[in-house]
């Protein structure tokens, strides 16, 4: 009887520590880079959310604020989570998000996820029409610049008719080129214009026709 009790006690310890070992923890680390100034991004808020299997609801797992080295580090329990989403936010910077699937994470290893973002900047496309006529037709399209964001300008061809002096504001990555290709119908006036936009500010791009 005594041997049976010892065996059962040993089995209980094995199950207890075996389960704890099986649960384990993940370590997720990385560096947030500021592409506008080519350096680590200080003071960025990094948040990790997990979506549980079956209910599609996100819950905050961990959060941190980057120091001068731009680094963040999370250690969190392995749970029944389908995937995680990493959010990077800072005022006057483009918010970034990165999906990290549960199947991609490894135990007993440091899982590296680096993220790059850029300072916000703006271009003012300032259009002047000299000697305007009702049948004037200007078209232009973005050739290079920020695309694919909720704040980004229309990516197709822009048309202006008749007498129109106007300004169009578009967002861009700071310290990056923003250029347009334009053409005035019925004339030889065509070309490409571009400026490098100043971070946190508005840079003027003049288009005269």
Residue ranges and their predicted role:
Residues 54-71, 147-164:
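Short, acidic Ser/Thr/Gly-rich low-complexity loop/linker segments typical of extracellular
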Residues 1-39:
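Bacterial Sec-dependent N-terminal signal peptides
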Residues 28-34, 70, 121-130:
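A short, amphipathic beta-strand motif
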Residues 37-54, 131-150:
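Short, ordered, surface-exposed loop/turn motifs in non-cytosolic proteins
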